[in-house]
């Protein structure tokens, strides 16, 4: 073994992992999983928002006396143009609120990640990898 490799092994062996350290490492992992889950959820909601916006545009150019099928759960309701516009507007607003909430949650996780990285890298230096 080279001298630098031996030094690295010695450094790893010298740093003991206590229960509090392990809890922080586990928390980092759980937060990382949650962040990826939120990112997938955000992507799905953004796709739904795009579809809803397209539907809203289609309604705009439709005849006023037309009837539209609106999906509610597993059922379809036949509604007039005004009701359809109102329902889609409410749905779009809900999606936008959900996306803002997800963004806020992701930012909170990023802040906690930064805090944990500072603490854990200070103790374990290069013997721990907290990158995604």
UniProtKB/Swiss-Prot annotation:
InterPro entries: PFD_beta-like, PFDN4, Prefoldin
Signal peptide boundaries: none
BP GO annotations: protein folding
Record has Transferase as a keyword: no
Keyword Chaperone in record: yes
Cross-referenced CDD domains: Prefoldin_4 (cd23165)
Superkingdom field: Eukaryota
GO CC terms of this entry: cytoplasm; prefoldin complex
Function: Binds specifically to cytosolic chaperonin (c-CPN) and transfers target proteins to it. Binds to nascent polypeptide chain and promotes folding in an environment in which there are many competing pathways for nonnative proteins.
Family indicated by similarity: Belongs to the prefoldin subunit beta family.
Descriptive protein name: Probable prefoldin subunit 4
Organism for this UniProt entry: Dictyostelium discoideum (Social amoeba)
């Amino acid at each position: 073994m080279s001298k630098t490799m031996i030094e690295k092994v010695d450094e790893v062996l010298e740093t003991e992992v206590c229960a509090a350290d392990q809890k922080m490492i586990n928390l980092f992992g759980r937060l990382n999983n949650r962040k990826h889950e939120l990112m997938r959820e955000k992507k799905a909601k953004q796709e739904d928002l795009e579809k809803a916006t397209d539907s809203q545009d289609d309604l705009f150019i439709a005849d006023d006396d037309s009837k539209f099928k609106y999906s509610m759960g597993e059922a379809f309701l036949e509604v007039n143009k005004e009701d359809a516009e109102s329902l889609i507007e409410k749905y779009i607003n809900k999606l936008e609120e959900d996306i803002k909430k997800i963004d806020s949650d992701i930012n909170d996780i990023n802040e906690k990640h930064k805090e944990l990285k500072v603490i854990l890298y200070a103790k374990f230096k290069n013997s721990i990898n907290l990158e995604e």
